[in-house]
Amino acid sequence: MAFIGVDHGTTAMRFALIEGEKVLTFELGRSEAAAMSEKEILESIEKEFEVKVKDIDLIALTYSMGDGFSEIKDVKKIEGRGLQSTEGAGKKTGGGTRVFDAVKNSGIPAIAIPGLHTRSKVDPRMKVFSHLTSPEKLGIAYHIRCMGYKDFVVSDISSNTVTLAVASGKVIGAIDACIFAPGVHHGPLDLEAIRNVDDGLRTANQAFMEAGALKMTPYKDRGELLNAAENGEEPALLALDTISLFAAMEIVSMQLLLKEYGVTGAAFLAGSVGEVEYVQKKISRHLGQECLSLGKWHAAIGCAGIARDVFAGENHILGIDVDYP
């Protein structure tokens, strides 16, 4: 039986196939996916996974914020691709839209995974914020759950930073990219950013997308930053030190929430910056505990695991209700 998970990432669309014990992965850049037809998207899936569309049992999709619904459900029951609005925090390329529509229109059985927001079953105090995390982070969390962990915090650090807490196998809260810890490109709006928005110099979304640690440096993107850090350049190391400090703060805050639920748990790091050894060591030192690192594929693999287990009849995933079939 073949199950596929799709991670709508910041820079790429990542796909994972679970077929028995076999796990395969591939990715399409978001701009690359946007330039493809729906037919070409499906052909890529067939080619990379050596599987026919008709033989796919279930696909689990993530799309953008996922704030228009709160249950895992059939994509046919989703309106507006599961969004309250197409506006929001992040860059629009059209790649995620192309993949979502290709799967929805293909006839392949598919479910959509929601993000966490005010209508989700999380700690009610977290609902002071309208949005907590986008759907692919639940894929990461479910992959960790399938590894045997019931209590944990995971921080996904890349273009932005999002941290999520799971207690007794249920997600209880998360801190979204625009709330606290900065990533490389994105971060919360500070005083200067708010003034720039009020003065019409930036939209709020532009300010968010320019609020990451990269603004402290002369580098133009994440690749340049990480290469410079490998060469020991001071501005790059300061940026990574900054990201590490605030990510550690975010992890500690979620660990505090775990304690209120009577548990303690492991700390995981994910994302292209979270898997950098320098960052791992810094955060582990801040926390006083070893952090376990995940690669960039775990969101897609976790989503494929959700597809597999929903197909097998699971009614709840990480405490989230399932409305399928």
From Swiss-Prot:
UniProt cross-references to InterPro entries, sorted A to Z: ATPase_NBD, Methan_mark_12
Family of this protein: Belongs to the UPF0285 family.
Name used for this protein in its record: UPF0285 protein MM_0679
Organism: Methanosarcina mazei (strain ATCC BAA-159 / DSM 3647 / Goe1 / Go1 / JCM 11833 / OCM 88) (Methanosarcina frisia)
Lineage summary: Archaea, Methanobacteriati, Methanobacteriota, Stenosarchaea group, Methanomicrobia
